[in-house]
Structure formats: structure tokens, C-alpha cells
Amino acid sequence: MVKKLTAFLLLMMLTLTVALADTQVQDDAGLFTADEIAEISAICDRIESAYQVDMFVLTSHDVPSGRTTAYADDYFDYNGLGMGDDRAGMLYLIDMHNRQCWISTRGVMIDYITDEREEGILDAGWDEMLDKEYGQSVIKVLKQTEKYLKQGRTSGQFRYDE
């Protein structure tokens, strides 16, 4: 009985380890190769370590029509994303149903990713997106995000409640 219980516990720990190994990429639409996922995860790791923000990439075919923004925001809110007390982070969604990309930010990331910078981030991967090179598009998006983080917050920026 003890051997069976030990084997079961080891199996559960292995399952949990595998589930947590790729926490920055949820490729529900099946757009990325294994190599692309590895590179995307490495860039996310680098950003997370340097800036203490959570980075997450999500792809989906199942976003309801006209709900891309709400889907991204809700996914961030209800899936435990974000670091620290302010749940700082960024989610990048590729919505294949509505044919849209969206960035959702929380915490300190709001201060770094202004509307203008968000457009620059989306533009960085646009050509690859049009060519259906989704993995390369995300890599460019993340590298542009990292560039803006290195530049720091823009002067004169402020937040207001919507």
C-alpha cells in the first residue's frame, strides 16, 4: 500500500511539474512550434526576471465575437496572472476567431505600456502576423515590449479611472 501511495504521489508531482513548466504560453489555437514556444518562454523569463512582471501569451479560436478585449482582461483576472501586490504583467492575445491581437496590462506595466507604445508593440509583429508566421510575430512583440521596458516610463504619464 505504501509503495502504491508513494508511486501515486510521485506521479502527481511529475504531472504538476509538467503543467507548470510552460506557464507563459497557452497556445490553444496551435499556432507555434515547440522551438517557438521555447524561445517565447525564454524571452518571457528574461523580462520577468529583469522587471518583476508576469508575461503571458495566449492564442485562441474560441473568443466570442466582439469580445477580444474582455476575453484578454478576464483571462488575466481569473487565471492568477500578475506579480506582486499590483499583479503587474502583460497578456498578449492572438484571437483567431475575431482575427485580432490584443494587449492587456496590469499594475506597473500600465505605466510602461502607454497607448502609443502598445501600438508600437502591435506594429512590431504585424508583418509576420500577416504572413502567418505567428511565433516570429510574438517574438518581435515581446522584444519590442522589452525595449520599451528598458527605456523606462514616459515622462508626463498619468493614470485615470475610466
Regions found by a protein language model. Give the residues of each.
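Residue-level detector of intrinsically disordered/flexible regions characterized by low predicted structural confidence
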Residues: 5-6, 21
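N-terminal secretory signal peptides that target proteins for export/translocation
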Residues: 1-2
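Bacterial N-terminal signal peptides
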Residues: 7-17
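Folded, non-transmembrane soluble domains that reside on the lumenal/extracytoplasmic side of membranes
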Residues: 20-162
